[in-house]
Each structure stands twice: as C-alpha cells, then as structure tokens.
C-alpha cells in the first residue's frame, strides 16, 4: 500500500486525487490519501473499483509551497508528516508528494531517519537522452556538498539502477566543465580520484553538452548544479515546441508540414515531458519517498505512482541498506 499527500502541489487536491484514481483503476493497488478529508471527498468523482481501493486519512494542516522546512517540520498534523508516519510505522510501503520539496525532504529525514552511512540524502531524477534515459543525482536536495557526499550519491544511484532498472553495471560520470581529469572546481577535482578508485563503471567527467547523448547511466553533481541542469532542460524542451508552433507550423504550408509530422512530434514531446516520469525518489532516507514536480497534474501523479510501485517491488531499500558508503575505508 502506498500513501499520497493529497494537499501537495500547485493543483492539489483535484489533480492529485484524479491521478490516484487513474492509477488505482489501472493497477488495483491500494492507496491512502492524506489531507483535508472534506476537500478530498469532493474530488473523488470516479465510480467503479477505484473507490474501494482508496482510503482517506484526515490531516488538518497543510504545508504550503512557500513554507520554510524549519516551519513545515513543526506541523505534526500536516498531510506530509502524517503520510511519512505511515511509512515509518510500516503501514505504507512508500510516500508520494508533489508538495514543497524542501519541506518533504526535511520531514522525511526527521521522521524516517537516514540510512546508516549516508550523510546527505539526494534526489535522483531521469533525463531523456538520444538512446533512452540517464539519471541525474543530486537534482536539488543539497546545495553545498563534500567529495564524500558525491561518492555516496554515486553508490546510491548505482544500487537504484541495478535493482529498480536491472542495469548490471551502471556507467557513472561526474559533471564538470571538461572531460579531462583535472578539470573542474575544487570539489570536482577532489571527487574524481575517489570515484575513479572506488566506483565500478566510472567513466570520468562529462560535459553539459553530452548529458543528453546517453553516454552515461548516472550523472553525479551537487544539488545546486544538478537543479540548474534539470530546470534548464525542462525549459529548453518547452521553448523548442513553442518556437516550432510559432515560427515553423504557421500558414498553409507550415500547417500541412505539422500535420505530416504530427505523430513523430507527439512521440518526441512525450519523451521530453516530465509528466511521463512522474516523480523522483529521495535516496538515503530509511523509507521509499518520491517527490514530484509542483506542477504535476493527473498524468504525472499516475506515472509517478507506477515508478514508485516498481521501486518498492524491486527490493531497492533492502539493497541500499546493505551498501558500503565509507569513502575512506581501505
């Protein structure tokens, strides 16, 4: 059973509830919706089997998108905290929220605790590439990190891809401003030899221009750089389609070309749409926690829950707990 924060996100609770119902209709999995009960019930519009698989737990407090984590963690009657408690107590196998990222992360660390050996939990998110997808870690959880943190990110990411995606030896690259060893700032220069020595599958530095070529399965970065990469990629993809619409597919000739290319363009747009991936796991806490985009609508919620189910069923958490995260151990 999974638990969902019904009040998190720009379009909560309506789009969250609709996405949950779509997921339940498709999979038959049980879901607990946590939030203001009266508001949730107003959105439970679908009939059929989904209603029998959805439980509601009331939570009077709401963590807003602008709220500071230090304030959010004090709200013990919020949908975030109550949902995480269900995971801690073993009632639910995973927690999903499209709410305030910082608040969810801080609450998860406080409520669930960190896995032994992990100093900084990190967000790992898929990015589309020419050959499929690559995974970026950290996508925004940690602005300031040390080399040992980046090492731990790489280890966690490899465990995730090996278990949830059955990639036997994931290729790991370190994001830098040049491919050669010795390029980068002080953090990158100190991290490179650690990954080179201790990470099987480490292929060296990767430049920004190669992220979407599919040369690596995992790209390691601090959360400041990683989040900029993520948001830049999202913005660029959206801008390209706006440009095509405004500058290319106009007039009779452009409209005809758009009609001919419609199927191909829809496939490309689908691959670039964050809603197709749905959510990103927070690795390093003692439980399965997925954080979705604040703009998530029903499609993103449904898909995010599907990925979270896959992660739970893979046994990822048990394997991560076995991991050796001590960078200084001989």
Curated annotation (Swiss-Prot):
Keywords: Cytoplasm, Lipid biosynthesis, Lipid metabolism, Phospholipid biosynthesis, Phospholipid metabolism, Transferase. It catalyses: a fatty acyl-[ACP] + phosphate = an acyl phosphate + holo-[ACP]. The keyword Lipid metabolism applies. Pfam families: FA_synthesis. It comes from the Bacteria. GO terms for cellular component: cytoplasm. Its main location: cytoplasm. One of its GO terms (molecular function) is phosphate:acyl-[acyl carrier protein] acyltransferase activity. Gene3D superfamilies: Isopropylmalate Dehydrogenase. It is found in: Cytoplasm. Pathway: Lipid metabolism; phospholipid metabolism. Its EC number is 2.3.1.274. One of its GO terms (biological process) is fatty acid biosynthetic process. Belongs to the PlsX family. Catalyzes the reversible formation of acyl-phosphate (acyl-PO(4)) from acyl-[acyl-carrier-protein] (acyl-ACP). This enzyme utilizes acyl-ACP as fatty acyl donor, but not acyl-CoA. Homodimer. Probably interacts with PlsY. This is Phosphate acyltransferase. It comes from Carboxydothermus hydrogenoformans (strain ATCC BAA-161 / DSM 6008 / Z-2901). The lineage of its organism: Bacteria, Bacillati, Bacillota, Clostridia, Thermoanaerobacterales. The gene is plsX.
